[in-house]
């Protein structure tokens, strides 16, 4: 499958249409707003599959309450009935559920998952062709040597919640799709830095100046305060000490 998410500008719509028109029938554009259906139908010949993205509600700490992407929980079933149900060129196959903070064992995540499952159940009763649930957001990756996350428990519990809800509503369980960006590639690479010089700036703080910049090579450290496993390559027999790592730029955020 080729799952096409996000807001779609003209070129994106044209590229999706070219895939489908050239025979890639398992290309599924995920509808992000009410106008995208018209844009896609103007470019795609014949019948094609679509999905709908749920506009999830964010954690209280976010600066906004509802995701900018997708269609609100309460509007999805009515949107399907008005614009999709009687359209013979459209086949709804997928509901897309994405949480910005990722999959975590928190009350917030389980609450949003339950709301998503309720939408799937309600939509499935109206739309027999719906058979896919795409769970985005992804698992966390190891960011310290003390990292402890029970992946198997989370997988089992998510599947269990979906199955219980579907069984109670007497609807078929969906095929599960996942989009785990960081989890998939987070440990596929690394960065090597050389310590050029150590500065003792006060009684408690030592700075190891490196031959690079965290702003350019590890931007998540300053942009979203992401932590990474940082280990010495050599001198493991030396006495350990607490240090701050400083990048080469003059920017005050260039440190770890």
Task: Describe the residue ranges of each PLM region.
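Active-site-proximal beta-alpha core segment in soluble small-molecule metabolic enzymes
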Residues: 1-132, 141
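Conserved, mostly hydrophobic/aromatic
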Residues: 52, 95, 135, 179, ...
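Conserved protein kinase catalytic core
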Residues: 59, 102, 144, 185, ...
């Amino acid at each position: 499958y080729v799952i096409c998410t996000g807001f779609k500008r003209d070129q994106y719509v044209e590229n999706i249409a070219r895939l489908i028109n050239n025979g890639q029938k398992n290309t599924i554009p995920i509808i992000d707003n009410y106008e995208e259906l018209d844009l896609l139908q103007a470019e795609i010949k014949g019948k094609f599959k679509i999905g709908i993205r749920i506009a999830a509600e964010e954690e209280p700490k976010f600066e906004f309450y509802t995701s900018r992407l997708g269609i609100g929980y309460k509007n999805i079933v009515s949107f399907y009935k008005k614009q999709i149900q009687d359209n013979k060129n459209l086949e709804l196959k997928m509901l897309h559920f994405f949480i910005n903070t990722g999959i975590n064992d928190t009350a917030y995540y389980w609450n949003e998952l339950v709301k998503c499952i309720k939408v799937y159940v309600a939509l499935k009763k109206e739309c027999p062709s719906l058979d896919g649930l795409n769970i985005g957001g992804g698992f966390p990756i190891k960011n310290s040597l003390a990292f402890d996350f029970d992946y198997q428990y989370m997988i089992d519990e998510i599947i269990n919640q979906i199955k219980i809800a579907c069984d109670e509503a007497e609807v078929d369980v969906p095929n599960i799709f996942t989009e785990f960006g960081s989890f998939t590639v987070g440990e596929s690479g690394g960065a090597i830095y050389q310590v050029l010089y150590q500065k003792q700036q006060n009684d408690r703080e030592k700075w190891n100046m490196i031959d690079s910049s965290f702003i350019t090579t590890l931007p998540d450290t300053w942009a979203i305060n992401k932590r990474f496993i940082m280990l010495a390559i050599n001198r493991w027999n030396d006495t350990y000490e607490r240090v701050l790592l400083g990048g080469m730029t003059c920017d005050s955020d260039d440190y770890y």
